[in-house]
Amino acid sequence: MGDGRAAGVLAGHMVRATRQLRQLLPAVDVAWEVADARAPRASRGPGLARICGDKPRVVILAKRDLAEAAVTDAWLGRLRGDTPAVALDLAGGAADLGPLWQATREALVRSGRRPPSQSWRAVVLGLPNTGKSTLLNRVSGGRHAAVGAVPGVTRGPQWIRLPAGGRVCDLPGVLPPRLDLWPVAWRLLAVGAVGAPQVDAQRAAEALLGWVAARSPRTLEARYGLESETPPYLDQVAAARGWLLAGGLPDTERAAAGILADWRRGLLGCVSLEVPGGEDGGDARADGA
């Protein structure tokens, strides 16, 4: 499928997902909005607050094990000024879901719509690869037992009964990301929320390495054997790994793919891609400005 056709298909998914969310909201008590703890601003679905209106929400920063702990705590402090928020490590063994249940109860109590002792319904929202599926596996005990449609919602997702009480569903489709801002776009590609056809992978990998070099200077030397902490990084990584084209030119396309794969596997360490502060989440050099 060509890039243009793929983009058209993706746009169709986005429209359907947004429409389905609007139809679903009256049937739920709370929205769980999942974002990547490494990029809490960039990976939150744009427009969700407007679409959800006064519906209670809980912001869940997943993959906290891949982010800087102090930075994640700072983000939680900022987010909690508006809505309950938690950070979860969903990888590996059993996750501690206590903070999520507590935040959900808090959101429901704040809304005054439903006492937390009664059955409640939640919808899981977020961009792709932010941790939604892993969260559903954890909260459902890995069973994913569908319990049927909710009255008033004639078509759409099946609901899963939770061991802790309540029901939850994952919104199918793709919520639209914000790709017109480069500082947002490269971070979304780095965390895997969008694909390379949508964002220039080589430019994004260069921006990623610039950010990592600024926050964790020894990481690039340890991983790739780089002696210089100045760009262009892709050329250096390609040369260090022997990824060369005919004539000895650096294969920057292969280097970009390798760097992004390393990052997503956590091989470049625990580095947050955004810190509370500036509107773009980073400095001009890291953002490729």
PLM regions with names:
Residues A122-G141, A145-V147, L171:
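Glycine-rich phosphate-binding P-loop
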Residues V58, D65-L125, H144:
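Canonical P-loop GTPase G-domain recognition
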Residues G92, R114-P116, G126-P128, V139, ...:
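Short, well-structured alpha-helical patches and their helix-loop capping segments
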Residues L90, L136, G166-C169:
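Conserved active-site beta-strand-loop modules that form the wall/rim of enzyme catalytic pockets
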Residues M1-A31, A37-V58, R64, A70, ...:
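Helix-rich effector regions associated with P-loop NTPase G domains
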Residues S111-P115, N137, R143-A149, R215-T219:
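Short, structured loop/turn "capping" segments at alpha-beta junctions
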Residues T104-A107, G142, A240-R241, W263:
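Alpha-helix boundary/capping residues
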